[in-house]
Design a protein with these regions (language model features):
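Single conserved hydrophobic/aromatic residue that forms the stacking wall/gate
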Residues: 2-8, 13, 553-556
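Alpha/beta enzyme core
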Residues: 55-79, 86-106, 117-163, 188-200, ...
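Active-site beta-loop-alpha junctions enriched in small/polar residues
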Residues: 42-46, 85-87, 109-115, 142-146, ...
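ATP-dependent carboxylate/acyl-activation modules
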Residues: 218-219, 223-301, 306-309, 313-321, ...
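Domain-level signature for proteins that mediate thiol-based redox and metal-cofactor handling
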Residues: 115-120, 125-132, 138, 148-247
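Active-site mouth loops of central-metabolism enzymes
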Residues: 48-64, 111-122, 176-189, 254-281, ...
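Alpha-helix-loop-beta-strand connector modules within alpha/beta enzyme cores
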Residues: 10, 14-31, 92-108, 157-169, ...
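Glycine-rich, aromatic-flanked loop segments that form ligand/cofactor-binding clefts
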Residues: 1, 16-51, 164-166, 234-256
């Protein structure tokens, strides 16, 4: 529909792409001098923002791009170059449309501002993480600024990217004179900076707005003999949302556990009643209390989990910019969520069972993600650290067959209840150490499992949490609304010099009394109308408004 409206008619789209590619191929053959010159189908944005920031559905955008991609391949394009994208969600729709409907290599470039942000908020690591997860062939930056202004962004891209990098600047920043836009970087100046771009590691270079044949010719002249740097594989374990990236492996991160019906009567009721505002408030409370990632589990008997999981993920991403952990054993629900997720999600989980790996790894390969590997297999949970480490190695080896790297695997060392397994904590801590030191993989635990069946569980949980962090826990699945757990987290990072000058600890506790209550959930705190509107909580905003109007009426 959008393609038809933008170009004029279905026939016009088909003919425009066919004729454009034919003319480019004719020109390339004429100028080739016997060299092989490739023709790229260049695909830009739709001009619309996707929901929730705009009114365009993800799948509608996908279908629009799909039509163009298919026509491009049929017309003879050698590759697809998606460019000038300012929204990771639209970018994902375009990449999936290209990969699912053609066999062509896919390049993608985005338009960053001087802060290193896309229009919709994504930073450089977020964009790189998502695109690499989608198996892009090359990525980079185009438009928006001149070559000199692009250098700081390029340095960030080179730091995180493990695939070839593309740079296509404007001929400087756009300027106005007598009502006309012009660019003031000369071909010589442009080419001089592009030499530095190649020195930094860019593999594909070109020009965007304001560049002329003279700019490109001078760039080729100055850069053609510069050796191309080899591509360096990076080992960052990173998850992302549309607005931020979270790196695992430095300090210990927090996955908020509250969006999960297990043991939560009120949450189960909310799922059955389709009370999404309750779920969203759980997410917001955890973000406010320090979570870095939010677990999302909506599995209940007699609930359409695939549909509800997709809906909850979309709604959560409209009110929080934290990365999400897709927590389900239903692979249909998992794929639904991964497909519409805006970023690179965490996925909970796969196990060492062959059936599990056969089902989950293809989804991770297709959509990207950091997947949690449970240290159990067909024989159950090993009683020893050695057994769990061997299963971890098995998971990593099997993932490699799908092209999934170790950096995109986090192993759950499994916290066992000490009331029934007295040696459970010791085995788990040893497993954490060995996974860190011998296997070199990030780790995760559902920390509160350790205390099940015991009185005063917060005491056991917080002490064990500290011990786990000391033994290599990369990320803990905890309740961030619990003061005991958060005190343990802040204190540990201050004591281990993972909190520069104890800044986070001081900011958190300098104005607080020495003791504070433990909260099982943060949902009960009173939210203001302003906060409800800013968070996108429609039902909460309506409720607060009604209460305010009623109170005002009574006072009158």
């Amino acid at each position: 529909e959008i393609g038809v409206r933008l170009v004029g008619s279905e026939m016009c789209i088909r003919d425009s792409i066919r004729l454009a590619i034919r003319h480019v191929k004719d020109a390339a053959e004429e100028a080739s001098g016997g060299r092989r010159i490739y023709t790229a189908l260049d695909v830009g944005p739709t001009g619309k923002l996707l929901k929730p920031m705009g009114d365009l559905d993800f799948e509608t955008a996908y279908e629009t791009f799909k039509e163009v991609m298919i026509l491009g391949e049929k017309a003879g394009a050698d590759l697809i170059h998606i460019e000038t994208m300012s929204d990771t969600y639209e970018l994902k729709a375009a990449v999936l449309a290209a990969k699912e409907n053609t066999s062509l290599p896919v390049f993608a470039t985005t338009i960053f501002d001087e802060r290193g942000k896309l229009l919709t908020g994504a930073d450089v690591p977020s964009v790189v993480a998502m695109l690499e997860g989608l198996r892009i062939d090359a990525l980079g930056i185009n438009c928006g600024m001149g070559p000199e202004q692009m250098l700081p962004i390029l340095e960030q891209i080179m730091k995180y990217s493990s695939v070839p990098v593309i740079v296509k600047p404007n001929a400087g920043l756009p300027k106005q004179k007598d009502g006309e836009t012009y660019y003031d970087v000369s071909p010589e100046e442009f080419a001089s900076v592009m030499r530095h771009v190649v020195d930094l590691g860019a593999v594909v270079i070109g020009g965007c707005c304001g560049t002329t044949p003279a700019h490109i010719a001078e760039m080729v002249k100055q850069c053609k003999d510069i050796p191309v740097k080899p591509i360096e594989k990076k080992s960052y374990t990173v998850v992302s949302s549309y607005g931020q990236s979270v790196f695992l492996g430095t300090g210990s991160k927090i996955i908020g556990e509250r969006i999960n019906p297990t043991g939560k009567k009120r949450f189960k009721q909310a799922l059955k009643e389709h009370d999404l505002d309750y779920i969203l408030k759980e997410g917001i409370a955890q973000q406010d209390n320090g979570a870095h990632i939010l677990d999302v589990n909506v599995g209940l008997p007699d609930i359409d989990e695939p549909t509800l999981m997709k809906e909850v993920v979309q709604e959560l991403q409209s009110v929080t910019n934290l990365p999400l952990q897709i927590d389900t054993v239903d692979t249909v629900a998992m794929e639904n969520a991964l497909r519409i997720y805006n970023g690179k999600a965490m996925v909970n989980s796969v196990s060492g069972k062959q059936e599990s790996m056969d089902a989950v790894f293809p989804l991770i390969r297709k959509y990207g993600g950091v997947v949690i590997g449970l240290a159990l297999d067909e024989d159950g949970i090993p009683a020893t650290a050695e057994g769990r480490v061997q299963i971890a190695k098995k998971i990593i080896a099997e993932a490699a067959k799908y092209g999934i790297e170790k950096k995109d695997i986090v192993i759950d060392a499994l916290a066992m209840t000490i009331s029934s397994e007295p040696e459970g904590a010791k085995v788990t801590l040893e497993t954490l150490r060995r996974l860190r030191d011998e296997v070199g993989v990030c780790t995760v635990l559902g920390v509160s499992n350790i205390s099940f069946g015991l009185p005063s569980r917060p005491i056991v949980n917080s002490i064990f949490y500290t011990m786990a962090m000391q033994n290599g826990l990369s990320v803990g699945i905890i309740n961030p609304n619990s003061e005991d757990m958060m005190k343990a987290w802040y204190a540990y990072h201050a004591l281990m010099n993972l909190d520069s000058n104890c800044e986070n600890y001081i900011n958190k506790y300098a104005q607080q009394p020495g003791t504070a209550p433990v909260s099982a959930t943060g949902s009960a705190h009173k939210m203001t109308l302003k906060s409800a509107i800013e968070r996108g909580l429609r039902e909460e905003a309506n409720s607060i408004t009604s209460e305010t109007v009623s109170y005002t009426h009574l006072r009158a």
